[in-house]
Amino acid sequence: TDEAITSGDLHRYVPALGSRQRDLLFVWLPGTGAETQEFQNILGVAAYAGYRSISLAYKNNVTVNRECGCTESECESSCKPDYPDCELEVRREIVYGDDTQVSSLACDSPCVDVSRADSIENRLLRLLQKLNEDEPSLGLEGFYDGESVRWDKIVIAGWSQGGGHAGIIAKDYEVARAVYVSKGAGAVAQNGMPVPVPWASLPRQT
């Protein structure tokens, strides 16, 4: 779909199978280390509900907990467990890529290295463009506009790490719906107790 994508380009697409095709796209983000084909049943349920459905491959070999849990003295301060915005910054780079601006905020964490090409957003955009080029009858042209994903037409969902990325997208954009399965955000310690990371309480577009 894009020659600049370095790995994990094995996506899954399922057309709508129900009697009523919705004008929405269901996008599923797998968890850490999971393969797109492992969630075929979830795509099937979405398809029978009338959604065209995609299980999107991305750089899910990067784990947020590991990248934000560095305890070595040479670690960047923003990659250590006591830095509250590490998860937000790491997830934004995985979703949008480094050196990217979203909602006037830079997406460039020193804890990970995910290019714009390898980002979730670019992978989804290039997949939609490729599918529409190869099979125009699928009717996917309404889910992107030029070089931009039409997030307002997308139900974004994910499991574990993928659920957290879905949460970031729903924070930054108005999406059709958002579903977090077994995690929407991580936790930080406060007075010896785990509480949701700060970004979970920030104003949201969705």
Q: Language-model segments: which ranges?
A:
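Conserved hydrolase catalytic core segment
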Residues: 168-177
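The feature captures the conserved acid-bearing segment of alpha/beta-hydrolase catalytic domains
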Residues: 10-19, 176-206
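Gly/Ala-rich beta-loop-alpha elbow adjacent to hydrolase catalytic centers
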Residues: 155-166
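Short beta-strand element of the alpha/beta-hydrolase
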Residues: 22-31
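Short amphipathic alpha-helix adjacent to the substrate-entry channel of hydrolases
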Residues: 38-56
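Short beta-to-alpha linker loops that shape the active-site pocket of alpha/beta-hydrolase fold enzymes
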Residues: 57-62, 184
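Alpha/beta-hydrolase active-site loop
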Residues: 77-148
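Serine-hydrolase catalytic-loop signature spanning alpha/beta hydrolases and amidase-signature enzymes
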Residues: 33-35
